[in-house]
Swiss-Prot record:
Gene3D superfamilies: 3.30.230.10, GHMP kinase, C-terminal domain (3.30.70.890). Belongs to the GHMP kinase family. IspE subfamily. The gene is ispE. It catalyses: 4-CDP-2-C-methyl-D-erythritol + ATP = 4-CDP-2-C-methyl-D-erythritol 2-phosphate + ADP + H(+). This is 4-diphosphocytidyl-2-C-methyl-D-erythritol kinase. ATP binds at residues 100-110. HAMAP family: IspE. The active site is at residues 16, 142. PANTHER family: 4-DIPHOSPHOCYTIDYL-2-C-METHYL-D-ERYTHRITOL KINASE, CHLOROPLASTIC. GO terms for biological process: isopentenyl diphosphate biosynthetic process, methylerythritol 4-phosphate pathway; terpenoid biosynthetic process. It comes from the Bacteria. Keywords: ATP-binding, Isoprene biosynthesis, Kinase, Nucleotide-binding, Transferase.
Amino acid sequence: MQDLAGKKIIIKSPAKINLHLEVIGKREDGFHELAMIMQNIDLFDYLEFQINNEGLIKLESDCTDLSLSSDNLIVKSANLLRKKLNIDCGANIFLRKNIPIGAGLAGGSSNAAATLIGLNKLWDLNVDQKTLFSLASTLGSDIPFFINGGIQLCFGRGEILEKLDSNFDYGVILLKNPNVSVSTAETYSKYSNRFCYQYLTNGEMIENIRNNLRDNGLNNLNFDKQHLTIKNDLQLVVENDNDSVKEALYLLSKLENCLTFSMSGSGPTCFAIFKDIETAKKELNANSKLFEDKGYDAWVCTFFEKGITFI
């Protein structure tokens, strides 16, 4: 391996929203069978990677609410890559956090994918994409999506990916109460307790749902033409149990130029979609005081056509 002293890499790690989230059943491995459309947005964390000569993974961040120890997905990703390749390379990693934690925007999953990609380049490993996908899948269900990102169909527990070709340029307003976070595991457990009677076990029926999303998923995202409702099965649970999510959805639904609205992932972040970023910015400017008075953080962004990207 060549001398890499002083080498530094900076990566943009994007958030995602769910444009479709359907819980189909329960798998033998304990995970849920899902049919989803995931879309990256241009709300980014930034990760800086630099070689250290101590053979250690050292993580620092500007976010004081984040664990920086071995249970952090960034550290887990780095250690898994080292174990897989039987190497003892070290790295100093700094995370500049913009994506809210526990928000349904998959910031942690995105950071994990960024770590695999960033260290692969930093350490000059030349690990192929198939291996990166395999490692990502080991770490978490959402993580493989971020390797290529953009907009994708996601099946299985989220690791079976099919790229969609779209040129959507919608604007997005995100709304989240900073004092509220939601456990993904608890949300799925609650959903299972309430709706497991609807679960499918027949493979052919599951494949029919996948095919329907393949055939119609992209067409159903023309919100400006059809004003379609976004399906998120988990919203049924979170909205019922969390008044702030219910209120956020109501506030977004009343925005004058809102095309559609939903909760992202397991929440609690909610979002509204507008025909373009300019319209979204105008709506946020007009309603920023209302959101602030009611205790919500708000962001405006747009769809992002890529996943992890180098700066």
